[in-house]
Each structure stands twice: as C-alpha cells, then as structure tokens.
C-alpha cells in the first residue's frame, strides 16, 4: 500500500539511521526528501511545509529523551508528525450488539461503494455479528448483480430489486422489514454528486426513513487532494456524516494526499480499502498505518489476521509442531494459512524492517513460490510428505515431472522445509528466531531467486 511513498520516506530516514554524525545540514537534507515524497503523493503543499518546519524545529532544538539516541529521536519526531497529519486518533465503528444497527453508505459513482458494502459486511461478520445488505442503487445497471455475487460469496443475506422498477426508498423500506433477523443492516445507495439535488433529496428521505446509526461516506483514494472538496461537499449537504471510508489505497500514488486531505476537515476516517478481496478492509489506525509505511511493522494487525484465519486444521498443525512433529504435511498447512491471510505485500509490510525496504519483485515472487511449493507437495505421496528424507534422485524426477517443474525447484522446497523445521525447533526450545537469523533466512529464501 502506498509503496512509492513508503520507499521514499524510508530512504530519507535511512540517511539519518546510517549517518555517522547528525548535524543541521543532514536534518535539512532529510526534510527536503520527506517534502518531496509527500508532495509526490499529492499531500497539500501548505500542510507539508508546516509539518516540515515542526520536524526541523524539534530535531534541532529538542534534546533526545532518556533512552533514545539522537537518530532514534529524529525518526520518532518524523513518525509523530506524520501521524498528526493523518488525524492521530483511531476512530472505531461503535455497534451495540443488543440493538439492530443501520449503516448508510453514500458517495459518488465509481468510488467503490458497492464493493465496500460487502467488505463492511464481512468485517462486521468477523466481529461475531450478523450483517444484512440492501441494494438500493437502481440507477447503475450492474449494482444489484455485483452486490448479489459478493453477498453470496460471504454468505450474507441481501435484499434488492433485480428488475429495478421500485424506488430506492421503497426497496429500503421493504428491506428493513425482510432483514429482521440480522444485527446490522448496510444500505448501498446510488452514486451521486453535490449538484444532483433530486438524488440528495432522496438520500435525505432514506436517512429519515432508516434513522441510521452511522452514515459512511466512501471516497476514492486515487482522488488525492480532491478528496477534501468531495468530503466537504457531502458534509455540507448531509450534515450527519459519521465517518469516511477511503478505497483503492493499494494501488494509488495519491493515497497520502487523499488521507491527509480528509483528515484536514476533521472528518474521521474509520476504514481503508487495501485490496480487491472482501477481506481487504481495515479499521484505520494512523499510528499503525505510518508504522507500516515507514517499514516499522504492525505486529498487532498481523496477529489479528492470523487469528481471523485460524481454523481446526491450522490449530492441529500448530499442535503437531509444538509437539516436535514437523513434516511436509505441517509445512503445507502453514503455507495454506499464509495464503489465506491476504496479499503477501500487505503481510510483509506488517513485519518490522520489511515494509519500506521490500524489493519491488519480492512480494510477487513470494506468492508465486508459495503456490509452486504447494503444487510440488500435491505431487508427492503421503509417505514422502511424512518422510521428506526419502526424496532422492528417482523420486525427485517423478515429483518434478508430476508438478511440471525442474528438479532444482524440488530441492529448493526441501531446503526451505529444512530451514523452517530448524526455526520451529528453536521456537520449541524457547528461542525466538530473529529477522537476521533463521527467520530472515526463511523470508529471503521465499523472496529471492536462487
């Protein structure tokens, strides 16, 4: 997410981290690099200038607090100021499990509202609540079908009018009646602009009808600074906007501009879309977000993701590993778990030291290797999976042919298995593998070509 911005900011801070001596000249040079990175991400020039002055003042005038070196203190100053730029505090979606809640999604056409409705339903579902969806957009021909496909994928009830003959208000009224058994109703409304008075009037009518607990404005992250005007316009026309959901941050060069622009008008950003899948919606936490951008990691989110995909088979696999059993069967289960966690680039950005320094091809190569490793193991017999040491020349040839790969790739898999087994062995003995040691070796083997 925001790869170029993260890389540029990390490069700037590395000048501080790698310097023998930090003086005023170096501080100014680093600040110039930070300015350039933020402006390229479409952050408002005035905001960047004000933030830069504050970083320079603190870096030059303030003495590092006890326990921090001068370098660490400057990195923390930059981190704190970037967090401030994005709104500082985390705004959570508050839902009362004892009462039915209603969420109204609004935004212009093309902002990713319909996909966000399904993502939000999935997010709520993972919190243990029962969501339901209402497809109230009758103006865009594919809106109902799109939401229907997504709702079926996540097993969430949907109410809508496939014929598009009913009004959004009538659909919403009927939907509220039909979805009595759910805990949270999410309404996907039609895309609109501030000039469309009839649509705005319709939206206000739906607001009065549903009395929503929260109105969420969905904004396209590729808009950059323009997001400010859009958020402002909707805030003026619908005064009760509860929060903002910013989409398409995974591939946007202007994502930083969009986030800072929305934060500037004090509209709380509660969610960000980080990919196309229904699970790619995150609660927005400025501190965690900046940590990942700067390559400092986000272990809390990584643990949350791990908990989300834990099932009985995963737990059995972990139990086997902790008892000292680690065969290719356990390795396969671990690769399955990693695959379920989401895009590899996103996962790696949560590991301290990996985010901003991640080579461009590394994440894709990692995903490709994981897939190939699984294909290779699918070509093995149960005996071979349980006893990898049996895989010698003749078996290597057969497995390689069955998987459609070279024998060297099977050897690469067995090497990865051996490294991982040793790392888990150390974990069992109470030793934590470090990124520079065996854990680093595991990641490097996945990320780089031999």
Curated annotation (Swiss-Prot):
Name of protein: Signal recognition particle 54 kDa protein
Domain of life of the native organism: Archaea
One annotated Gene Ontology cellular component of this protein: signal recognition particle
InterPro entries noted in UniProt: AAA+_ATPase (IPR003593), P-loop_NTPase (IPR027417), Signal_recog_part_SRP54_M_sf (IPR036891), Signal_recog_particl_SRP54_hlx (IPR013822), Signal_recog_particle_SRP54_M (IPR004125), SRP/SRP_N (IPR036225), SRP54 (IPR022941), SRP54_GTPase_dom (IPR000897)
Keyword Cell membrane: no
Described function: Involved in targeting and insertion of nascent membrane proteins into the cytoplasmic membrane. Binds to the hydrophobic signal sequence of the ribosome-nascent chain (RNC) as it emerges from the ribosomes. The SRP-RNC complex is then targeted to the cytoplasmic membrane where it interacts with the SRP receptor FtsY.
Organism from which the protein derives: Methanococcus maripaludis (strain C5 / ATCC BAA-1333)
Gene transcribed to yield this protein: srp54
Subcellular localization(s) per the UniProt record: Cytoplasm
GO molecular function, one term: ATP hydrolysis activity
